[in-house]
C-alpha cells in the first residue's frame, strides 16, 4: 500500500464511490479534491479556499531535470501527427458481451422498479438505497472489466489487472444487491415472485464474472483490502 501526503494511492480506483458510507474518506485524494471543488463553489468557504498555503505546506519547486523532461514531452505531443489514425478498438468476445447485456438489462429493470419509491439514498442500511446505489455501478464496472480484459489479453504481466479489480467491485455490488433484495422480501416490500427476476440476473452475473475473471475475488484493492496496513497507517498518524 502506497501512501502520499496522507492519501492512499489508488484507493478510489476500486471503491464503490459511496463516500457517505466510507471510512476511508480522510485518506482519499479524490474525496479531498471533490470537497475542495465544492468548497470553492460555496461562497461561505471562499475565503478559506483562497487563503495562501502556509510556508511549511508549500510544495518545493520541481527539479530542473523534471521541468526539462516535461517540456520535451509537451514538445513531442505538439509535433505528433494530428491526422495519425488511431488503432481500432477491439471488441469483447460474444460471450463477454452477453455479460454486458445482462448487466444493462438488470439496470434498466431495477431502475424502473425503483421509480416512484421514497427512500434515503444516503442510508446504507436501507435495502432500497443499496439497490439504488449499485444497480448502475454494476453495469458500469462490468463494462469496464470486460473491455479492459480485451486490452490485457496480449499483455504478459504479473501486475494485478484492472479488469480483475473492476470485476471485484461489480461482484461486491452484486453480493450487496442480492442481500438487499432478500431483505426487502423479509420486510414484505416485494413478493418472492416479483424479486425472482432480479435475483436471477444477479446470480447469473456473479457466476459469469467469476468464470471470466477467476482472480477477481482475490484482487487486493489499495487500502480497502489491506486492514493491517491501514491500521498501521492510522497508528502512525496518531503517534
Give the positions of each predicted feature.
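Charged linear interaction tracts used for macromolecular binding and regulation
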Residues: 63-161
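Conserved binding-pocket/active-site segment within a compact domain
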Residues: 124-204
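Charge-dense, extended regions
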Residues: 179-239
Amino acid at each position: 500500500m502506497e501512501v502520499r501526503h496522507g492519501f492512499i494511492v489508488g484507493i478510489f480506483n476500486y471503491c464503490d464511490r459511496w463516500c457517505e458510507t466510507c471510512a476511508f474518506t480522510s485518506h482519499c485524494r479524490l474525496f479531498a479534491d471533490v470537497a475542495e471543488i465544492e468548497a470553492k463553489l460555496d461562497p461561505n468557504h471562499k475565503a478559506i479556499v483562497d487563503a495562501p498555503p502556509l510556508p511549511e505546506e508549500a510544495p518545493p519547486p520541481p527539479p530542473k531535470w523534471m521541468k526539462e523532461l516535461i517540456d520535451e514531452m509537451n514538445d513531442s505531443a505538439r509535433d505528433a501527427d494530428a491526422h495519425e489514425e488511431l488503432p481500432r478498438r477491439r471488441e469483447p468476445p460474444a460471450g463477454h458481451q452477453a455479460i454486458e447485456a445482462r448487466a444493462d438489462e438488470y439496470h434498466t429493470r431495477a431502475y424502473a422498479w425503483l421509480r416512484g419509491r421514497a427512500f434515503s439514498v444516503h442510508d446504507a442500511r436501507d435495502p432500497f438505497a443499496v439497490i439504488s446505489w449499485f444497480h448502475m455501478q454494476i453495469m458500469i464496472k462490468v463494462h469496464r472489466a470486460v473491455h479492459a480484459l480485451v486490452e490485457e489479453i496480449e499483455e504478459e504481466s504479473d501486475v494485478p489487472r484492472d479488469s480483475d479489480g473492476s470485476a471485484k467491485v461489480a461482484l461486491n455490488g452484486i453480493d450487496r444487491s442480492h442481500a438487499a433484495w432478500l431483505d426487502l422480501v423479509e420486510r414484505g416490500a416485494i413478493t418472492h415472485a416479483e424479486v425472482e427476476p432480479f435475483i436471477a440476473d444477479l446470480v447469473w452475473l456473479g457466476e459469469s464474472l467469476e468464470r471470466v475473471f477467476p482472480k477477481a475475488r482475490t484482487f487486493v484493492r489499495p487500502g480497502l483490502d489491506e486492514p493491517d496496513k491501514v491500521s498501521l497507517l492510522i497508528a502512525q498518524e496518531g503517534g
